[in-house]
Protein backbone atom coordinates (compact mmCIF):
# COMPACT_ATOMS: atom_id res chain seq x y z
CA UNK A 1 0.00 0.00 0.00
CA UNK A 2 1.48 3.33 -1.03
CA UNK A 3 1.89 6.79 0.49
CA UNK A 4 2.04 5.75 4.12
CA UNK A 5 -1.34 4.05 4.27
CA UNK A 6 -1.32 1.21 6.76
CA UNK A 7 -2.33 -2.07 5.20
CA UNK A 8 -5.44 -3.64 6.67
CA UNK A 9 -5.98 -7.37 6.40
CA UNK A 10 -9.39 -8.26 4.92
CA UNK A 11 -11.24 -10.36 7.47
CA UNK A 12 -15.04 -10.38 7.62
CA UNK A 13 -16.63 -9.04 10.76
CA UNK A 14 -19.92 -10.28 12.12
CA UNK A 15 -21.47 -7.98 14.69
CA UNK A 16 -23.08 -9.47 17.78
CA UNK A 17 -25.98 -7.73 19.46
CA UNK A 18 -25.15 -6.69 23.01
CA UNK A 19 -27.55 -7.74 25.73
CA UNK A 20 -26.57 -4.87 28.02
CA UNK A 21 -28.98 -2.02 28.60
CA UNK A 22 -28.81 1.11 30.69
CA UNK A 23 -31.47 3.08 32.46
CA UNK A 24 -30.71 6.25 30.50
CA UNK A 25 -33.99 7.31 28.83
CA UNK A 26 -34.28 7.78 25.09
CA UNK A 27 -36.33 10.56 23.47
CA UNK A 28 -39.88 9.36 23.13
CA UNK A 29 -42.12 10.08 20.18
CA UNK A 30 -45.26 12.02 21.05
CA UNK A 31 -47.33 9.45 19.21
CA UNK A 32 -46.61 6.38 17.11
CA UNK A 33 -47.23 6.72 13.36
CA UNK A 34 -49.97 4.56 11.95
CA UNK A 35 -48.97 0.94 11.56
CA UNK A 36 -47.65 0.19 8.10
CA UNK A 37 -49.49 -2.22 5.85
CA UNK A 38 -47.63 -5.53 6.21
CA UNK A 39 -45.41 -6.36 3.26
CA UNK A 40 -44.09 -9.74 2.18
CA UNK A 41 -41.21 -11.09 4.24
CA UNK A 42 -37.84 -9.73 3.05
CA UNK A 43 -35.78 -11.93 0.79
CA UNK A 44 -32.10 -12.55 1.24
CA UNK A 45 -29.81 -10.27 -0.71
CA UNK A 46 -28.14 -11.66 -3.80
CA UNK A 47 -25.37 -9.05 -3.96
CA UNK A 48 -22.21 -9.92 -2.09
CA UNK A 49 -20.53 -6.92 -0.42
CA UNK A 50 -16.82 -6.68 0.16
CA UNK A 51 -15.15 -8.26 3.15
CA UNK A 52 -14.81 -5.87 6.03
CA UNK A 53 -11.22 -5.17 7.13
CA UNK A 54 -10.25 -5.63 10.73
CA UNK A 55 -9.81 -2.57 12.90
CA UNK A 56 -12.04 -0.31 14.99
CA UNK A 57 -15.60 -1.28 14.17
CA UNK A 58 -19.06 -0.13 15.16
CA UNK A 59 -21.09 -2.55 17.22
CA UNK A 60 -24.81 -3.14 17.54
CA UNK A 61 -26.13 -2.27 20.96
CA UNK A 62 -29.30 -1.90 22.95
CA UNK A 63 -27.99 1.06 24.94
CA UNK A 64 -30.67 3.72 25.22
CA UNK A 65 -29.78 7.16 23.95
CA UNK A 66 -30.15 10.57 25.49
CA UNK A 67 -29.32 12.73 22.48
CA UNK A 68 -28.89 16.49 22.63
CA UNK A 69 -29.33 19.16 19.91
CA UNK A 70 -26.75 20.50 17.40
CA UNK A 71 -25.26 21.68 13.97
CA UNK A 72 -25.07 22.18 9.98
CA UNK A 73 -25.15 20.41 6.29
CA UNK A 74 -23.78 20.50 2.66
CA UNK A 75 -24.89 21.71 -0.90
CA UNK A 76 -25.87 20.75 -4.79
CA UNK A 77 -25.64 21.75 -8.84
CA UNK A 78 -26.31 20.80 -12.60
CA UNK A 79 -25.63 21.32 -16.35
CA UNK A 80 -27.58 23.69 -18.66
CA UNK A 81 -31.35 23.14 -18.58
CA UNK A 82 -33.24 22.25 -21.75
CA UNK A 83 -34.39 25.13 -23.94
CA UNK A 84 -37.39 26.87 -22.43
CA UNK A 85 -36.65 25.53 -18.96
CA UNK A 86 -36.11 27.33 -15.68
CA UNK A 87 -33.82 30.30 -15.01
CA UNK A 88 -32.02 30.82 -11.71
CA UNK A 89 -33.11 33.96 -9.81
CA UNK A 90 -30.39 36.06 -8.13
CA UNK A 91 -28.97 34.65 -4.92
CA UNK A 92 -29.29 36.60 -1.70
CA UNK A 93 -27.60 35.62 1.53
CA UNK A 94 -30.05 36.73 4.19
CA UNK A 95 -33.71 36.58 5.13
CA UNK A 96 -35.87 39.55 4.04
CA UNK A 97 -33.25 41.17 1.80
CA UNK A 98 -34.09 43.02 -1.40
CA UNK A 99 -33.47 39.78 -3.36
CA UNK A 100 -34.51 37.14 -0.84
CA UNK A 101 -38.13 36.90 0.39
CA UNK A 102 -38.96 36.75 4.07
CA UNK A 103 -39.34 33.17 5.21
CA UNK A 104 -43.09 33.60 5.83
CA UNK A 105 -43.77 35.38 2.52
CA UNK A 106 -45.70 32.59 0.81
CA UNK A 107 -46.56 34.46 -2.39
CA UNK A 108 -43.00 35.74 -2.92
CA UNK A 109 -41.46 32.30 -2.45
CA UNK A 110 -43.98 30.62 -4.74
CA UNK A 111 -43.19 33.24 -7.38
CA UNK A 112 -39.43 32.83 -6.90
CA UNK A 113 -39.11 29.04 -7.26
CA UNK A 114 -38.85 28.08 -10.94
CA UNK A 115 -40.15 24.81 -12.44
CA UNK A 116 -40.74 23.61 -16.02
CA UNK A 117 -44.02 24.37 -17.84
CA UNK A 118 -46.86 22.18 -16.62
CA UNK A 119 -45.63 22.14 -13.01
CA UNK A 120 -46.66 24.21 -9.99
CA UNK A 121 -44.81 25.14 -6.79
CA UNK A 122 -46.65 25.40 -3.48
CA UNK A 123 -45.27 26.68 -0.18
CA UNK A 124 -46.35 23.58 1.73
CA UNK A 125 -44.93 24.14 5.22
CA UNK A 126 -42.20 25.67 7.32
CA UNK A 127 -40.51 24.05 10.31
CA UNK A 128 -38.61 25.68 13.15
CA UNK A 129 -34.93 25.10 12.40
CA UNK A 130 -32.78 23.95 9.52
CA UNK A 131 -34.07 20.78 7.83
CA UNK A 132 -31.52 18.06 7.14
CA UNK A 133 -33.56 15.08 5.91
CA UNK A 134 -37.15 13.94 5.25
CA UNK A 135 -39.19 10.73 5.07
CA UNK A 136 -42.83 9.82 4.57
CA UNK A 137 -44.26 7.57 7.25
CA UNK A 138 -46.64 4.63 6.96
CA UNK A 139 -49.35 7.15 7.92
CA UNK A 140 -48.52 8.99 4.65
CA UNK A 141 -47.45 12.06 6.63
CA UNK A 142 -44.17 13.87 6.07
CA UNK A 143 -41.49 13.71 8.79
CA UNK A 144 -38.73 16.34 8.76
CA UNK A 145 -35.56 16.26 10.89
CA UNK A 146 -33.79 19.51 11.72
CA UNK A 147 -30.19 20.21 12.59
CA UNK A 148 -31.00 21.10 16.20
CA UNK A 149 -32.23 17.56 16.88
CA UNK A 150 -36.02 17.55 16.55
CA UNK A 151 -38.02 15.44 14.11
CA UNK A 152 -41.30 17.09 13.10
CA UNK A 153 -44.41 15.42 11.74
CA UNK A 154 -46.48 17.49 9.30
CA UNK A 155 -50.21 16.93 8.96
CA UNK A 156 -51.99 16.85 5.59
CA UNK A 157 -52.18 20.65 5.61
CA UNK A 158 -48.46 21.03 6.32
CA UNK A 159 -48.85 22.05 9.96
CA UNK A 160 -45.80 20.75 11.87
CA UNK A 161 -45.80 19.20 15.31
CA UNK A 162 -42.77 17.93 17.23
CA UNK A 163 -42.73 14.13 16.99
CA UNK A 164 -39.48 13.32 18.81
CA UNK A 165 -36.44 15.37 19.83
CA UNK A 166 -33.04 15.43 21.46
CA UNK A 167 -30.86 13.95 18.70
CA UNK A 168 -27.47 15.40 17.80
CA UNK A 169 -27.58 16.50 14.15
CA UNK A 170 -29.85 13.84 12.66
CA UNK A 171 -28.99 13.56 8.95
CA UNK A 172 -30.83 10.38 7.99
CA UNK A 173 -34.30 9.05 8.77
CA UNK A 174 -36.20 6.11 7.27
CA UNK A 175 -39.23 4.04 8.19
CA UNK A 176 -38.98 0.26 8.25
CA UNK A 177 -41.21 -0.96 5.39
CA UNK A 178 -42.82 -3.70 7.51
CA UNK A 179 -42.76 -2.63 11.17
CA UNK A 180 -43.19 1.10 10.52
CA UNK A 181 -40.46 1.91 13.06
CA UNK A 182 -38.47 5.10 12.50
CA UNK A 183 -34.69 4.72 12.13
CA UNK A 184 -32.46 7.75 12.78
CA UNK A 185 -28.81 8.32 11.83
CA UNK A 186 -27.15 11.01 13.93
CA UNK A 187 -23.98 12.04 15.68
CA UNK A 188 -23.28 10.83 19.19
CA UNK A 189 -21.58 14.09 20.23
CA UNK A 190 -20.94 17.48 18.66
CA UNK A 191 -17.13 17.26 18.52
CA UNK A 192 -15.50 16.77 15.10
CA UNK A 193 -12.31 15.17 16.41
CA UNK A 194 -12.66 11.54 17.50
CA UNK A 195 -16.38 11.82 16.97
CA UNK A 196 -18.88 9.01 16.67
CA UNK A 197 -22.14 8.51 14.82
CA UNK A 198 -24.94 6.12 15.64
CA UNK A 199 -28.15 4.58 14.31
CA UNK A 200 -31.19 4.44 16.57
CA UNK A 201 -34.80 3.33 16.47
CA UNK A 202 -37.26 5.82 17.93
CA UNK A 203 -38.63 4.59 21.29
CA UNK A 204 -36.11 1.72 21.39
CA UNK A 205 -32.65 3.31 21.35
CA UNK A 206 -29.36 2.78 19.59
CA UNK A 207 -28.91 -0.35 17.53
CA UNK A 208 -25.49 0.60 16.05
CA UNK A 209 -22.87 2.83 17.63
CA UNK A 210 -19.21 3.59 17.04
CA UNK A 211 -19.61 4.52 13.37
CA UNK A 212 -16.87 6.88 12.12
CA UNK A 213 -17.32 10.62 12.38
CA UNK A 214 -16.36 13.44 11.68
CA UNK A 215 -14.40 15.53 9.17
CA UNK A 216 -17.04 18.23 9.28
CA UNK A 217 -20.51 18.30 10.75
CA UNK A 218 -21.96 16.18 7.94
CA UNK A 219 -19.28 13.55 7.45
CA UNK A 220 -21.07 11.00 9.60
CA UNK A 221 -23.74 8.34 9.30
CA UNK A 222 -26.14 10.11 6.94
CA UNK A 223 -28.87 8.90 4.60
CA UNK A 224 -30.69 5.65 5.45
CA UNK A 225 -32.76 3.51 3.08
CA UNK A 226 -34.25 0.04 3.26
CA UNK A 227 -33.53 -2.10 0.23
CA UNK A 228 -35.74 -4.52 -1.70
CA UNK A 229 -33.76 -7.28 0.03
CA UNK A 230 -35.09 -6.20 3.44
CA UNK A 231 -31.73 -4.91 4.72
CA UNK A 232 -31.00 -1.42 5.98
CA UNK A 233 -28.41 0.68 4.16
CA UNK A 234 -26.61 3.79 5.39
CA UNK A 235 -24.01 6.11 3.88
CA UNK A 236 -21.05 7.00 6.12
CA UNK A 237 -18.71 9.90 5.29
CA UNK A 238 -14.91 9.92 5.33
CA UNK A 239 -12.94 11.45 8.18
CA UNK A 240 -10.71 13.58 5.94
CA UNK A 241 -10.73 15.83 2.88
CA UNK A 242 -8.79 13.53 0.54
CA UNK A 243 -7.44 10.69 2.65
CA UNK A 244 -5.29 12.40 5.26
CA UNK A 245 -6.31 12.15 8.89
CA UNK A 246 -7.92 15.32 10.22
CA UNK A 247 -5.32 17.73 11.62
CA UNK A 248 -2.36 16.09 9.87
CA UNK A 249 -0.79 15.94 6.42
CA UNK A 250 -0.47 12.18 6.46
CA UNK A 251 -2.69 9.40 5.33
CA UNK A 252 -3.21 6.84 8.05
CA UNK A 253 -5.22 3.66 8.26
CA UNK A 254 -8.75 4.28 7.04
CA UNK A 255 -11.51 3.32 9.42
CA UNK A 256 -13.08 0.10 8.08
CA UNK A 257 -16.48 1.77 7.73
CA UNK A 258 -15.67 5.32 6.62
CA UNK A 259 -16.43 6.64 3.13
CA UNK A 260 -18.67 3.65 2.50
CA UNK A 261 -22.20 2.37 2.16
CA UNK A 262 -22.98 -0.13 4.92
CA UNK A 263 -25.61 -2.84 4.99
CA UNK A 264 -27.14 -4.19 8.21
CA UNK A 265 -29.96 -6.31 9.58
CA UNK A 266 -32.87 -4.30 10.91
CA UNK A 267 -31.78 -5.09 14.49
CA UNK A 268 -28.33 -3.59 13.80
CA UNK A 269 -26.51 -6.90 13.50
CA UNK A 270 -24.28 -8.25 10.72
CA UNK A 271 -22.90 -4.88 9.63
CA UNK A 272 -20.96 -5.17 6.38
CA UNK A 273 -19.54 -2.92 3.69
CA UNK A 274 -21.72 -2.88 0.57
CA UNK A 275 -19.56 -0.45 -1.45
CA UNK A 276 -16.50 1.69 -0.73
CA UNK A 277 -14.89 4.92 -1.87
CA UNK A 278 -17.77 7.39 -1.47
CA UNK A 279 -16.19 10.38 0.29
CA UNK A 280 -19.33 11.83 1.81
CA UNK A 281 -22.57 10.12 0.78
CA UNK A 282 -25.15 12.51 2.19
CA UNK A 283 -28.10 10.55 0.87
CA UNK A 284 -28.93 7.26 -0.86
CA UNK A 285 -31.97 6.07 -2.83
CA UNK A 286 -33.19 2.94 -4.60
CA UNK A 287 -34.56 3.36 -8.12
CA UNK A 288 -37.22 1.38 -9.96
CA UNK A 289 -34.62 -1.00 -11.39
CA UNK A 290 -33.40 -2.05 -7.95
CA UNK A 291 -30.19 0.00 -8.21
CA UNK A 292 -28.88 1.96 -5.22
CA UNK A 293 -27.61 5.51 -5.87
CA UNK A 294 -25.55 7.83 -3.66
CA UNK A 295 -24.74 11.52 -3.83
CA UNK A 296 -21.10 12.28 -3.04
CA UNK A 297 -19.37 15.47 -1.94
CA UNK A 298 -15.87 15.55 -3.43
CA UNK A 299 -12.69 17.00 -1.82
CA UNK A 300 -12.67 20.69 -1.00
CA UNK A 301 -10.01 21.86 -3.46
CA UNK A 302 -12.04 21.57 -6.65
CA UNK A 303 -12.80 18.22 -8.30
CA UNK A 304 -16.39 17.83 -9.52
CA UNK A 305 -19.09 16.53 -7.21
CA UNK A 306 -20.35 13.04 -7.96
CA UNK A 307 -23.36 10.76 -8.32
CA UNK A 308 -22.77 7.00 -8.15
CA UNK A 309 -24.80 3.95 -9.03
CA UNK A 310 -23.38 1.68 -6.38
CA UNK A 311 -21.89 -1.65 -7.36
CA UNK A 312 -21.78 -4.25 -4.57
CA UNK A 313 -18.19 -4.89 -3.53
CA UNK A 314 -16.82 -2.07 -5.70
CA UNK A 315 -14.28 0.65 -4.92
CA UNK A 316 -15.81 3.94 -6.09
CA UNK A 317 -12.74 6.14 -5.78
CA UNK A 318 -12.15 7.92 -2.49
CA UNK A 319 -9.45 8.86 -1.69
CA UNK A 320 -7.83 8.25 -5.08
CA UNK A 321 -10.12 9.18 -7.97
CA UNK A 322 -9.73 12.44 -9.95
CA UNK A 323 -7.27 14.00 -7.55
CA UNK A 324 -3.74 14.90 -8.67
CA UNK A 325 -2.57 15.76 -5.16
CA UNK A 326 -4.26 12.81 -3.42
CA UNK A 327 -2.76 9.53 -2.33
CA UNK A 328 -2.54 6.95 -5.10
CA UNK A 329 -4.41 3.61 -5.01
CA UNK A 330 -2.59 0.42 -4.10
CA UNK A 331 -1.57 -1.77 -7.06
CA UNK A 332 -4.40 -3.83 -8.46
CA UNK A 333 -7.25 -1.72 -7.07
CA UNK A 334 -9.84 -1.02 -9.76
CA UNK A 335 -11.57 2.30 -9.16
CA UNK A 336 -15.01 2.90 -10.66
CA UNK A 337 -15.59 6.48 -11.86
CA UNK A 338 -18.83 8.28 -10.99
CA UNK A 339 -21.84 7.85 -13.27
CA UNK A 340 -22.54 11.59 -13.26
CA UNK A 341 -20.76 14.70 -12.04
CA UNK A 342 -21.84 18.16 -10.95
CA UNK A 343 -19.86 21.40 -10.75
CA UNK A 344 -17.23 21.65 -8.02
CA UNK A 345 -18.50 22.68 -4.58
CA UNK A 346 -22.15 22.15 -5.55
CA UNK A 347 -22.60 19.85 -2.52
CA UNK A 348 -25.11 17.24 -3.72
CA UNK A 349 -27.22 16.26 -0.74
CA UNK A 350 -30.69 14.74 -1.08
CA UNK A 351 -31.66 12.22 -3.75
CA UNK A 352 -34.87 10.45 -4.69
CA UNK A 353 -35.91 8.22 -7.58
CA UNK A 354 -39.24 9.12 -9.13
CA UNK A 355 -41.18 5.85 -9.21
CA UNK A 356 -44.68 7.32 -9.28
CA UNK A 357 -46.73 7.72 -12.47
CA UNK A 358 -48.06 11.22 -11.73
CA UNK A 359 -45.31 13.20 -13.54
CA UNK A 360 -45.66 12.01 -17.17
CA UNK A 361 -42.37 10.88 -18.69
CA UNK A 362 -40.43 11.11 -15.42
CA UNK A 363 -40.52 7.51 -14.24
CA UNK A 364 -37.15 6.48 -12.75
CA UNK A 365 -35.73 9.99 -13.10
CA UNK A 366 -33.39 10.84 -10.25
CA UNK A 367 -33.85 14.19 -8.51
CA UNK A 368 -30.84 15.58 -6.64
CA UNK A 369 -30.64 18.70 -4.46
CA UNK A 370 -27.55 20.89 -4.83
CA UNK A 371 -27.24 22.67 -1.49
CA UNK A 372 -24.29 25.02 -1.99
CA UNK A 373 -24.30 28.76 -2.57
CA UNK A 374 -21.54 28.33 -5.17
CA UNK A 375 -22.48 29.22 -8.77
CA UNK A 376 -24.37 26.39 -10.43
CA UNK A 377 -26.00 25.08 -7.29
CA UNK A 378 -29.06 25.98 -5.16
CA UNK A 379 -31.16 23.78 -7.41
CA UNK A 380 -32.97 20.50 -7.88
CA UNK A 381 -31.35 18.59 -10.73
CA UNK A 382 -33.08 15.94 -12.83
CA UNK A 383 -31.03 12.98 -14.09
CA UNK A 384 -33.05 10.99 -16.60
CA UNK A 385 -32.78 7.25 -17.31
CA UNK A 386 -31.28 8.02 -20.73
CA UNK A 387 -28.45 10.01 -19.15
CA UNK A 388 -29.60 13.62 -19.56
CA UNK A 389 -29.21 15.95 -16.60
CA UNK A 390 -30.56 19.47 -16.20
CA UNK A 391 -31.88 21.97 -13.66
CA UNK A 392 -35.46 20.95 -12.94
CA UNK A 393 -36.15 23.58 -10.27
CA UNK A 394 -34.28 26.73 -9.22
CA UNK A 395 -34.58 29.66 -6.84
CA UNK A 396 -33.86 28.01 -3.49
CA UNK A 397 -31.56 29.30 -0.77
CA UNK A 398 -30.11 25.89 0.19
CA UNK A 399 -32.16 22.87 -0.94
CA UNK A 400 -31.04 19.97 1.23
CA UNK A 401 -33.44 17.11 0.51
CA UNK A 402 -36.04 16.00 -2.01
CA UNK A 403 -38.56 13.18 -1.71
CA UNK A 404 -41.51 11.74 -3.62
CA UNK A 405 -44.75 11.77 -1.66
CA UNK A 406 -47.49 9.13 -1.71
CA UNK A 407 -49.47 11.64 -3.81
CA UNK A 408 -46.78 11.54 -6.52
CA UNK A 409 -45.65 15.11 -5.84
CA UNK A 410 -42.09 16.16 -5.08
CA UNK A 411 -41.27 17.75 -1.74
CA UNK A 412 -38.14 19.88 -1.37
CA UNK A 413 -36.70 21.00 1.99
CA UNK A 414 -34.71 24.24 2.11
CA UNK A 415 -32.09 24.15 4.86
CA UNK A 416 -31.59 27.93 5.05
CA UNK A 417 -35.25 28.88 5.45
CA UNK A 418 -36.96 25.82 6.93
CA UNK A 419 -39.50 25.89 4.09
CA UNK A 420 -40.89 22.70 2.56
CA UNK A 421 -41.97 23.20 -1.05
CA UNK A 422 -44.36 20.95 -2.95
CA UNK A 423 -43.94 20.52 -6.72
CA UNK A 424 -47.01 19.13 -8.48
CA UNK A 425 -47.94 18.43 -12.09
CA UNK A 426 -50.92 20.45 -13.41
CA UNK A 427 -50.62 19.76 -17.15
CA UNK A 428 -49.37 21.84 -20.05
Describe every region a protein language model picked out:
Residues 6-91, 428:
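Ser/Thr-rich, Proline-interspersed low-complexity disordered segments
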Residues 71-116, 238-272, 279-280, 284-390, ...:
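Beta-propeller domain segments
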Residues 123-128, 162-167, 208-216, 273-277, ...:
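Surface loop/turn motifs at the tips and blade-to-blade linkers of beta-strand repeat domains
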Residues 127, 137, 176-178, 227-229, ...:
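Structural WD40 beta-propeller signal
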Residues 134, 173, 224, 281-284, ...:
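Hydrophobic core register within WD40 beta-propeller blades
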Residues 141-144, 181-185, 231-235, 291-295, ...:
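Conserved beta-propeller blade signature
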Residues 151-182, 186:
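Blade-loop segments of beta-propeller domains
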Residues 170, 188-226:
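Asp-box/WD-like beta-propeller blade repeats and closely related beta-sheet repeat scaffolds
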